[in-house]
Amino acid sequence: MTQKNLLLLCGGGGDEHSISLLSANFFEAQLATLPHFNVLRVELNAKGQYHTQAGELCELTNSQQLRFDDETKAPWNVDYVIPCIHGYPGETGDIQSYFELINLPYFGCDSESSSNCFNKVTAKMWFSALGIPNTPYIFLSEFNQQSLEQAEAALAKWGSIFIKAASQGSSVGCYRVDSIEQLASSLEEAFTFSPYVVIEKTITARELEVAAYEADGEIIATKPGEIICASNTFYSFDEKYAENSQAQTVIEADVDEAIAKQIQEYAIKAFKGMKLRHLSRIDFFLTEDNEILLNEINTFPGQTQISMFPKMLQNHGHNFAQYLSGNILAQLKS
């Protein structure tokens, strides 16, 4: 078959820029095994500039071409894009909106589903509307005395809370608060990351993850894996990506079969209900009373050496490169 020009777009310039580059390494290695794709890796920096690995500045135009600042270099026609960008502007749906505007096909969830999942306010509304249990919560829209009083009431009611910036991923702007002394500073800090803040009841629970994705025309939800953190800690940004992280990952969690099946059913319900596409990682809590609570959905999960998504996909029996190729080719034919 004729080779397709595939743009591997990474970085993004946000808080998760460096992690996006690590994930791009994985995608690049997988794509190298697929001869029908001609891959060009381009990084998007914090200034909104595109540049190749050789440092060449370029621009993605509305004619579906990469045009280079060096006008002696011919434009590069783009057939397809993998937006390997965690956080803004990838998982927020912003970059997908541009692709949709210029009719450029791309891998992953569309702009609306990405935005709905990334924003914790809309995500929780969707979880509840779909009838999927999730953690008790309140929303705040600005840092003022009224919000502080609402947060104090939540802390008094629940004993321990998580304060989360509504529009951030990978636990950026996320703080556990166990005492009134921590409250004001944590709330104020969270508002520096997002105009909206979610306050959730702290749940003493196991942290389980499911890879939910499309393969061979069907939606798959793997058996849940597990994140095991040190006592009295949570899976923070540092715990996810630091070399000295104490968190442990288990690809197939030791849970009752009926519980695993229920989690998988919730994952597929969320995938279908929120109209996700190609890939996602859906995170759950499992309490000591075996209550299942949906925590969050990642529409472009990490693909680093320690990331759960590619490991769970492989454990389920799928080859990542073939899974990737199948989705891309099916979309290009449609």
UniProtKB/Swiss-Prot annotation:
Note on how the cofactor is bound: Binds 2 magnesium or manganese ions per subunit.
The reaction(s) this protein catalyses: 2 D-alanine + ATP = D-alanyl-D-alanine + ADP + phosphate + H(+)
EC class: ligase
Primary gene name: ddl
One annotated Gene Ontology cellular component of this protein: cytosol
Name of the protein in question: D-alanine--D-alanine ligase
Location within or outside the cell: Cytoplasm
Ligand binding (Mg(2+) 2): E296, N298
Pfam families linked: Dala_Dala_lig_C, Dala_Dala_lig_N
